[in-house]
Amino acid sequence: MELHNLSSPSPSLSSSVLPPSFSPSPSSAPSAFTTVGGSSGGPCHPTSSSLVSAFLAPILALEFVLGLVGNSLALFIFCIHTRPWTSNTVFLVSLVAADFLLISNLPLRVDYYLLHETWRFGAAACKVNLFMLSTNRTASVVFLTAIALNRYLKVVQPHHVLSRASVGAAARVAGGLWVGILLLNGHLLLSTFSGPSCLSYRVGTKPSASLRWHQALYLLEFFLPLALILFAIVSIGLTIRNRGLGGQAGPQRAMRVLAMVVAVYTICFLPSIIFGMASMVAFWLSACRSLDLCTQLFHGSLAFTYLNSVLDPVLYCFSSPNFLHQSRALLGLTRGRQGPVSDESSYQPSRQWRYREASRKAEAIGKLKVQGEVSLEKEGSSQG
């Protein structure tokens, strides 16, 4: 996601600061930041920081190398050494595909920041670059949420039809999600870009419905999935406690997976949300110095956003025992030959929980029988 400057009568994030999901408006021309109403307070003119460019260029280069190595290893393991696939594997592979969208475009962003935010590859390449970056963010959020909800179904609703979905059904769900993700970000391929910069939004002098929609979508992409993930964590925790699943590997691993999902989610996407909203508040308050600082911090937070391609392989280790085992084997960290490790663990209630439930049912049935006998005795005595 890219952000850069604010400039319109309504509060909005600027092109160097706004994520790619904020589509450029063909009718709007680039302009400086203005105060609310663009009047008496005078315009705000935040400057591009060479310090931010100097920070982002090497960081993104390092993320490219680490992300390429980690995700190449992940793709190799999932495609060659993972048999059979499960619904969880389908969503993990989709996350790998999303990461490669980012990794393949990071070298162009590194070059962009090395040249102090000067794009030299043409408008068509700029459109594709911003489209891929935006698609990566949306896909990462969507499939992290899908992984969390898949774990929720396995633990909390083990007998639900969705919990027993086949690999083919999971693949169709993932395909449908990809179609929606591409449609949400396709506007970037139809937008017009000019000038030396390659930014996802050029703010004009008039606010547009498109801008407000994309701002709302940007926030919704963060808060709605986060709410679903937290709901899954709380539900799984309560289920583990109530059903006595604490001693089973599957439910415990599900909790670790969701904890890792939350960690990746907050580390990668929360900084841009915080500084983006701070930029909007500074814009509303016509605080030019604060606005300049917040937009530069937002721009720098792109390093965290792009970090998801590095952290996702760590998530795969938590989510798939087979992936962890195969990774250790390929890296020479295990001794001897071991059979494949199944990713499917038991999520059924423990023996103690089943015993308690059976006792409760037997007790309830006994009470019903006693009540029935009492009622029969009353009827007999009344007839006599």
UniProtKB/Swiss-Prot annotation:
Q: Which domain of life is it from?
A: Eukaryota
- Residues covered by region (Disordered): 1-21
- The positions flagged as glycosylation sites are 5
Q: Which CDD domains match?
A: 7tmA_OXER1
- One Pfam family for this entry, by name? 7tm_1
Keyword Membrane tagged: yes
Q: What is its main location?
A: membrane
Molecular function, one GO term: G protein-coupled receptor activity
Query: Which cysteine pairs are covalently linked by disulfides here?
Result: 126-198
| Subcellular localization | Membrane
Query: Where is there biased composition of kind Low complexity?
Result: 7-21
Membrane topology (Extracellular): 1-58, 109-129, 194-215, 278-297
An annotated GO cellular component of this protein is: plasma membrane
Q: Which PROSITE patterns did the record assign?
A: G_PROTEIN_RECEP_F1_1, G_PROTEIN_RECEP_F1_2
User: Which ranges sit in the Cytoplasmic compartment?
Assistant: 80-87, 153-172, 237-256, 319-384
Q: GO biological process: what's one of them?
A: G protein-coupled receptor signaling pathway
Is Transmembrane among this UniProt entry's keywords? yes
Q: Where are the transmembrane segments?
A: 59-79, 88-108, 130-152, 173-193, 216-236, 257-277, 298-318
Known role: Receptor for eicosanoids and polyunsaturated fatty acids such as 5-oxo-6E,8Z,11Z,14Z-eicosatetraenoic acid (5-OXO-ETE), 5(S)-hydroperoxy-6E,8Z,11Z,14Z-eicosatetraenoic acid (5(S)-HPETE) and arachidonic acid. Seems to be coupled to the G(i)/G(o), families of heteromeric G proteins.
User: Which family does the record assign?
Assistant: Belongs to the G-protein coupled receptor 1 family.
Q: What is this protein called?
A: Oxoeicosanoid receptor 1
What is the species listed in this Swiss-Prot or TrEMBL entry? Homo sapiens (Human)
Name the gene for this chain.
Answer: OXER1
